[in-house]
């Protein structure tokens, strides 16, 4: 992550904490220890409890996901109402920038609210169950950055999910941060099945984003676009990744490795690959379990890919 991108995170957090926050509101940091954080790091939850006092740290009950409370996410109060945030705020922004393309995020976001931490924590925990799929699936950790970005993209009235949180700044999965504003409740929250299904495949979307980020750092002769910024990803990258996975799924692919392979080739070679008869044939065989796409595509040379791309319409955008 470049220093310019890191500075962007720091500026976003500073503006959120000092310009958007009202005098009666506290600033909270949401951390997920499941991502792993060295105990000696100043943003380790134990270190924050010692530095800020145990009353500044409130755990979010995720007992349906993990039994040990020490592994539950934590809501950390970085600033009381009317107080300026400490140096921990820019430090957390730097940490978020460094893990922008990671599979797991220790820093999940910054929240402002005039409500007590225990009420906010309880609400976040309850929404984990509201948004989850039926058994045997567990709760939905909707507060994770990419999952939150996907929720905003798929749920029309997503702002109703925030409850006591007036505003939530979160990494957006594309290399920057976005502000998520609360909306007033309009009755009981209706969660369409498509929203739940997207959360169910979120791990595949996160995996695809990570691979896309790594591949974008390498020059590919057939890549239709190169995006500015250190992440190498376009705006709304999680939504693009979600749409590509849906396209692969609709073509009959079910094997996770095949889906990832097909999506990465659509990203790095041409977004309309599935329209080409040769690729359609390969996908049909993979869907039938007769081959794996990675093995088959490995036999294609640059000449083969150039011929395939030449037979497709000009790439205008990702799905």
What residue spans do the PLM features occupy?
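A broadly used, surface-exposed interaction patch
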Residues: 70-120
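A contiguous, surface-oriented mixed alpha/beta subdomain in the mid-to-C-terminal portion of proteins
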Residues: 2-52, 56-70, 75, 113-319
